[in-house]
Amino acid sequence: ELLALGANDLQIGRRMVSFTGDKELLYKANFHCRTALRILKPIYHFKAKDADTVYKEVKKVEWEKYLSLDKTFAIDSVIYSEDFNHSKFVAYRTKDAIVDYFIEKFKKRPSVRVNNPDLYINIHISHNDCTLSIDSSGESLHKRGYRVDQTEAPLNEVLAAGMILKTGWKGESNFVDPMCG
């Protein structure tokens, strides 16, 4: 899907694919990718072996470029590391660093809102490699579409889209879903 949209430098990682492109590609990826839950835009890379280093590195980011005092934010963390045992703790330390950055610089802080924040921030740690990203998708991409209410699906929509892509089906013939009730 990403290649068809014009993405460059594709690299497959653990539960993710990274790519490069311009802002137009970012919008296209959010609109067209059926096999993605989120499209993240990396803003800072660093190495860390403990939560204190994460805090110090996150605090180095010029957060006013991405977040203002009147906006809300939430942190999502994904951890694949023996050095970090608890993803929520990493999320809390990331949040603390952002809040402390604003307090030290502006004497005020933006609010945290877990549900429907203005800005989703993701921290991904693989071993000691850390990436801070802005979530360009907002709500999970599987929730886009015309349906007002979502019900439990027997198969994750993103997984189903990936399976169909692997079959090579291009929509030129009928598609029969034997699992459909």
Residue ranges and their predicted role:
Residues I121-I134:
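C-terminal edge-of-domain segments
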Residues W63-K65, S111, Y120-N122, L165-K166, ...:
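A generic local secondary-structure boundary/capping motif
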Residues A91, K95, V99, N156-I164, ...:
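Hydrophobic, well-ordered secondary-structure segments
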Residues L132-K166:
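SAM-dependent Rossmann-like transferase core, predominantly class I methyltransferases
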Residues G171-G181:
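Conserved class I S-adenosyl-L-methionine
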Residues E1-P117:
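Non-catalytic nucleic-acid substrate-recognition regions in nucleic-acid-modifying enzymes
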Residues W63-L67, P154, I164-E172:
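Glycine-rich helix-loop-beta junction characteristic of Rossmann-like nucleotide cofactor-binding loops
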Residues R14, I134-S136, M179:
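Glycine-rich, histidine-containing beta strand-loop boundary motifs that form or position
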